[in-house]
């Protein structure tokens, strides 16, 4: 049944791609900014947002995406090692920051420092974060909390979400007292506030690589879209949403 549903989903995506090229698979945290950038493209792009891990697995399973934009290097490496990327097209386009957030009405205060009382700050609640088993934002969170020496105190008290935007929604709805997301996610959700920013040395650099997939032609709408991502106009949009352009 699962195989049938996956094939059905891939068929639906293929239909969308044939109608509106190119098909872009992009990390969920890019949605607001990338929607605005895509509006600049003369080609009508179909953009599917989700966890980088899930999108990479879909490409591996045959989804006809022509451009992949990941929220970490690992999942781009995963596809590259399996020959699902067009050689020579990969670019590191953006950087981001990891933040600790709370519902907008929360009065919690803390500094992110070794041994900080994260477990106590949660009270009887849980820490909302993207699933650290495979979603980039969750992996960055686990790495940071391990370096701070507090991971063991909260690892059994997570509210693991399928994507960073799903974790953001948990905090916005008040379903968890604290959570971790990217700074750009917090900036577009008025129902949350940033409690603290994690120093970048606590986790691997948060870098967004983009590349053509092996199913994309060397030139055409997909290649043009990839070039648009590093244009001056796109840089201005990404900066407006809090990303750090790397080109």
Give the role of each language-model region.
Residues 1-4:
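Positively charged n-region of N-terminal signal peptides that target proteins for export
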Residues 6-7, 17:
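Cleavable N-terminal signal peptides
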Residues 20-63, 68-73, 77-247:
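Exported/periplasmic ABC-transporter solute-binding proteins
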């Amino acid at each position: 049944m699962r195989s049938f549903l996956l094939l059905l989903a891939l068929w639906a995506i293929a239909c969308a791609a044939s109608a509106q090229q190119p098909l872009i698979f992009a990390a969920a945290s890019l949605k607001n900014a990338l929607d605005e950038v895509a509006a600049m493209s003369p080609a009508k792009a179909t953009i599917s947002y989700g966890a980088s891990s899930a999108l990479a697995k879909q490409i591996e399973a045959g989804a006809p995406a022509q451009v992949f934009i990941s929220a970490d290097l690992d999942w781009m490496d995963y596809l590259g090692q399996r020959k699902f990327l067009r050689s020579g097209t990969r670019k590191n386009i953006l950087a981001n920051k990891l933040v600790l957030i709370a519902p907008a009405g929360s009065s919690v205060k803390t500094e992110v420092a070794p041994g900080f009382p994260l477990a106590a700050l949660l009270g009887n609640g849980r820490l909302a974060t993207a699933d650290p088993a495979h979603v980039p934002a969750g992996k960055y969170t686990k790495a940071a909390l391990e370096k701070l020496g507090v991971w063991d105190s909260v690892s059994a008290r997570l509210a693991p979400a399928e994507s960073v935007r799903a974790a953001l929604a948990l905090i916005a709805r008040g379903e968890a007292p604290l959570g971790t997301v990217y700074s750009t996610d917090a900036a577009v959700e008025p129902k949350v506030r940033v409690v603290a920013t994690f120093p970048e040395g606590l986790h691997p650099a948060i870098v967004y690589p983009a590349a053509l997939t092996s199913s994309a032609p060397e030139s055409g709408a997909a290649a043009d879209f990839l070039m648009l991502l590093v244009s001056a106009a796109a840089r201005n949009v990404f900066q407006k949403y809090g990303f750090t352009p790397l080109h």
